[in-house]
Regions:
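Extracellular jelly-roll beta-sandwich "head" domains, especially the C-terminal globular C1q domain
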Residues: 25-160
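Low-complexity, small-hydrophobic/phenylalanine-enriched stretches
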Residues: 1-27
């Protein structure tokens, strides 16, 4: 169809060149935590968005939320014990360049979200999301890494 038209029924397409929205999601790697049945997140999730369309796109990263835990240390010897905290660092790199760095201590969560422009013809974009333990004790949580890519367009929407 090379002109405007009105479709007065259902349009079904199993293949569309120039998809409007694509999404991927993956959990972060985890290993056994410092105590019992706890887990500690640690590792990298890498997402590559290929520059394979002739229109501008936006990369949308919904909030990735991460936190450590507070725990009681009974103490021993010269260590009086008390409440201790696990902590985590979180970094995001775009094509190898650090674009965000966060950290959290204890149960107070840290988060990262973004909207990144991807102009057509600008080359592929590789995003690396890295979570790492800070300190000796490991126990914490992180949500899955989700990335949404959409055609950049402002028709039919307004923001003020």
């Amino acid at each position: 169809i090379n002109e405007n038209c009105t479709i007065k029924g259902m349009l079904e397409a199993t293949q569309v060149r120039g998809d409007f929205v694509k999404a991927v999601s993956k959990p972060f790697p985890k290993k056994t935590g410092s105590w019992g049945d706890t887990e500690t997140p640690g590792g990298t999730v890498t997402v590559t968005i290929y520059d394979d369309h002739n229109f501008d796109r936006q990369i949308i990263i919904p909030p990735i939320i991460f936190s450590g835990v507070a725990y009681d240390d009974p103490g021993s010897g010269n260590n009086p014990g008390g409440t201790r905290y696990t902590g985590y660092g979180f970094e995001v790199r775009k094509n190898g360049v650090l674009i965000a760095s966060r950290e959290t201590k204890g149960a107070i969560p840290g988060s990262y979200s973004a909207v990144i422009d991807m102009p057509s013809g600008g080359g592929s974009v590789t995003l690396e999301f890295k979570i790492f333990q800070k300190g000796n004790q490991g126990a914490g949580n992180i949500t899955d890494c989700t990335v949404i890519v959409t055609k950049k367009a402002a028709s039919g929407i307004s923001i003020r």
